[in-house]
Each structure stands twice: as structure tokens, then as C-alpha cells.
């Protein structure tokens, strides 16, 4: 019996694995429009550090949820869920196939499953205490506190993202349940006829690509991009918790020399990629394809297209 739910394609994978190029080729084959599955690409002026697709690279394929907020704005998982579900409907109404591409697992999961969020419930005094802890002992100490209490949430949230780390701790403090427990008690049926494809790669090769990508970002103006935000006094905003920005802020603050900041950026990017792979493997029904070079990209594209077409009966 044919699945009557709205078809959606999801392409996930760690940073630097090659999602962007492959997704555009697939979107053209599938008559799809792409929705960003990256929590930081929503911010304007943060192009290089978040590896946003350029106008030329899109090859005419429409992209959504990119450059929609100012760097000073806040953006939650609940906001993402609401926006993306609206975009899925819009795209489908145009007769196109919605395709989410990215690596922010919790955001993508929130769209696909019947998750509800209690964004307004909290404890301001506890939150202030956690903010003080982060300021005095650092983001790593705060993240370690979350890892001890809720390892699953800690795996999904980067230590630089202090706001989300505090929110996860606050949920536990207020309700007595971890964020992971809250999500588990909610309905686990996919809301869409979703095909989830994951790109993976030999870890050492991937780490090498990440290091090269950071070098290329710096060559193409990442430090200037970060300095513009720094000069605008964008400091405590969620956007600056992104990898690449927080590390270079440390340099601009005079706390560390540039080579040390760059090495920290590379290390944080590698650690994030490792967490992304672990999270997607444990949390979502993903069909994986290996992109370790040498690989025939056109052949991979064809194989993935046939997998999607078969599952969606298109």
C-alpha cells in the first residue's frame, strides 16, 4: 500500500563530507528544493565559517532557511521545526520534492518526529547560575556537567553552544527528566514519508579534509568575516557559539595567538564531525553511503537517486 504521507528526502553527514555538491546534483534529478539542515546558516554575514552554498554553486536549485536572521537574533529548535514544516508544505504545494540537507541532528529530528517543546518553562535563577559557571569555568566545564547528567543531549549539542547546553540542564533541573527522556516519551513515528541518506567517509580522510577546509576558509577571508561581527560587538549571541567564530574571538580578544586559535578550530571541527556520525547512527534510520576517495561521484549520485526513487515510488 502506498504511503500517503508527504515525501521528504533527508541528506545528512558530518562536516566536510561533501553534502553540498552531491545534494545539488540530486535535487536537479529529483525536481527538489533544498532546506538547510544547519543551525548556523540561518544567520546573515556568516558565510565562510558556516560553509554556505554560493549562488553559483546552487546551479539554480532553490535553497531555504539561509540568511534569514541577524547574528544578534536567537533561534531555537522549536523555531526551526515550525519554519521547516511550513517550508515542506510550501515546496510540496509547488509540485516539488522537499529535501533537507545538513548536519544538525537534533534540528532535523525535531522536524521528522512529533516533538513538542516547552520553550517558555524554566528557572531564570538556575539559568543565571549556569551562565556564571560558563563565564568562570568555561564552556567545556558546563558541557561536562551536561555530559554527566544527559550524555545523549551532550552528544547532540556542541560545547560551544552554551545556550543550548544551559537549556538542556535547565530542562533537567525543572522537570527532573533529561531532554533525551522528554524526547523518548513523545511519539516516535515519522510524520513524513522520509528517505534518510547519510554520507560517511574514512575517519582519517575526513579529518584531513576538515583541516584543509579550515585552511581554505582562512585563505578566503574567515578572519575578516569574524572581525566584522567582532567590531559590531556581536558577543553573547547564539550565532557566535558556532565553530570558527568562538575560537577566532579568543584570538581577537588577545587571549591566544592565531595559530593556537586555528588549531583549536580544527580540533573542534574534527570532534564535532565524530559526534555527528555517532549521533546520526544512533538516532535516525539512515541508509549510509561511503564517500571515501577515490569515488565516482556521478555513480554515487545515480545509486542514491535510484534508492530514493524506489522508496518514494517516483
From Swiss-Prot:
Needed co-factor(s): Mg(2+)
Residues annotated to bind ATP: 13-20
Pfam family membership, one: IPPT
GO terms assigned for molecular function: ATP binding; tRNA dimethylallyltransferase activity
Binding site for substrate: 15-20
Keywords: ATP-binding, Magnesium, Nucleotide-binding, Transferase, tRNA processing
Ranges where the record places region Interaction with substrate tRNA: 38-41
BP terms from Gene Ontology: tRNA modification
Entry keyword annotation includes Transferase: yes
EC top class named in words: transferase
Keyword Secreted set for record: no
InterPro entries listed in its UniProt record: Dimethylallyltransferase, IPT, P-loop_NTPase
Source species, domain of life: Bacteria
Enzyme Commission number, as recorded: 2.5.1.75
Reaction(s) the record says it catalyses: adenosine(37) in tRNA + dimethylallyl diphosphate = N(6)-dimethylallyladenosine(37) in tRNA + diphosphate
Site positions per UniProt: Interaction with substrate tRNA: 104, 127
Record note on quaternary structure: Monomer.
Protein family: Belongs to the IPP transferase family.
Function: Catalyzes the transfer of a dimethylallyl group onto the adenine at position 37 in tRNAs that read codons beginning with uridine, leading to the formation of N6-(dimethylallyl)adenosine (i(6)A).
The protein's name: tRNA dimethylallyltransferase
